[in-house]
Amino acid sequence: MTHQVHIIGGGMAGTEAAWQLARRGIRVRLSEMRGGGDTTPAHNGDGLAELVCSNSFRSDDDEKNAVGLLHYEMRQCDSLLMAAAAKARVPAGSALAVDRDVFSAEVEAALRAQPTLEIVRERVDVLPSDGLTIVATGPLTAPSLANSIGSATGADSLAFFDAIAPIVYRDSIDMGVAWMASRWDKGAEASLAMGGDGRDYINCPMTRDQYLAFREELLAGEKTEFKEWEANTPYFDGCMPIEVMAARGEETLRFGPMKPVGLDNPHWATAEHPNGRWPYAVVQLRQDNKLGTLWNMVGFQTKLKHAEQVRVFRTIPGLENAEFARLGGLHRNTFLNSPTLLDRQLRLKSAPNVRFAGQITGCEGYVESGSVGMLAGLMVAAQIAGLDWSPPPRTTALGALLAHITGDAEAESFQPMNVNFGLFSPVDASVKKKVRKEAYTARAKADLSDWIATLA
């Protein structure tokens, strides 16, 4: 069978993209290297859509939870993954958890039943130079293909190590303690050109005693261990975990990410120092999305366990009540700097016949990966049908996630991201915080319905 679309990778994104195309009668070749003599260090078998790290798709609450809303939106788009999850579901309270083997088998059976879909167990080593292609090879892309992608995109555009710093919701930061400023007021001209006011960082101050206590918490905090196949991956200077830096010496953090120089704290203003004084140490947060709702803890990539991160980082002045959109981590990964390399339709700008989907685009999580695969499939289907493609509204989970990875995120600090309400266009400021999540989901559902009517 001569294919119209080549999909590389049979994980969550690749299988969902293949389903969306095949059910529209489009001829698809789905290449998966597992089962063809190759595997990855993380997979146990060769099943399509094999779940590696967890059997949970997280919350299924579509009224108060962003990932639950994403479940809802995918179901409305006839998602194969959501249908398979329903058949493989196991008790897990309000979460959607599945039997991994049943889930994978359901996905594969549904795809094999499609007459226009061919599943080929083969490793693809080179990025295709022509023909419609979707690359959905995930975080453990084969080295040969990763090298080919790196050649096509530039050596600095393909990361092989996640340096994930925590991200905090802006409205949970105590600005009665923290303040806005840039070090030495540098970069004001560039900031103003980008629509800022020259004060681009949120700064959380520490006294000497607070700093020393915080350092001890970092050193004592319970940490996760590298998986066996990650253990030999070297640290890079820009990926050094915060607790590893802390262990190098008492002052290391103060001369690194917690450097206080050039940052006058106006809350500490006196008659002698009307602009305030420098703290002993400072934790800086940098805006992480264009909406200004999410702020990245600069230099705070970490291997602390998630519960420890919440506990330890809430000892930082100004972050006592911090709510985290994403917690930090450090692990081997392969992902593109998508805001730089991809257009709004997930096409590689330098080779528009190639689209990327799933975790390699910088989305994080099973559901997010599948949703981006679904969108890639819908985009290609529209292209083949000769139809204009309109992306889902940014008020929806699908639209917010797509916008984030294709341009809304800051390219210089781009890291993998789960779906969360901080990515959405804000609801009206008059909506009370208690009902804000319901406002997001109700608006999304209404806007999604209108968008679905436009699909091919």
From Swiss-Prot:
Top-level taxon: Bacteria
Cofactors, names only: FAD
Annotated GO biological process: tRNA methylation; tRNA wobble uridine modification
A Pfam family that the UniProt record links to this protein: GIDA
Annotated Gene Ontology cellular component terms: cytosol
PROSITE patterns to which the protein is assigned, alphabetical: GIDA_2
Chain residues that bind FAD: 9-14
Alphabetical UniProt keywords: Cytoplasm, FAD, Flavoprotein, Methyltransferase, NAD, NADP, Transferase, tRNA processing
Location of the protein in the cell: Cytoplasm
Main location: cytoplasm
UniProt EC number: 2.1.1.74
Reactions it catalyzes: uridine(54) in tRNA + (6R)-5,10-methylene-5,6,7,8-tetrahydrofolate + NADH + H(+) = 5-methyluridine(54) in tRNA + (6S)-5,6,7,8-tetrahydrofolate + NAD(+); uridine(54) in tRNA + (6R)-5,10-methylene-5,6,7,8-tetrahydrofolate + NADPH + H(+) = 5-methyluridine(54) in tRNA + (6S)-5,6,7,8-tetrahydrofolate + NADP(+)
GO MF annotations in UniProt: flavin adenine dinucleotide binding; tRNA (uracil(54)-C5)-methyltransferase activity, 5,10-methylenetetrahydrofolate-dependent
Enzyme class: transferase
NCBIfam families per the UniProt record, alphabetical: gid_trmFO, PRK05335.1
Cited HAMAP family: TrmFO (MF_01037)
Family indicated by similarity: Belongs to the MnmG family. TrmFO subfamily.
Function: Catalyzes the folate-dependent formation of 5-methyl-uridine at position 54 (M-5-U54) in all tRNAs.
Protein name (Swiss-Prot/TrEMBL): Methylenetetrahydrofolate--tRNA-(uracil-5-)-methyltransferase TrmFO
Taxonomic lineage of the native organism: Bacteria, Pseudomonadati, Pseudomonadota, Alphaproteobacteria, Sphingomonadales
Gene that produces this protein: trmFO
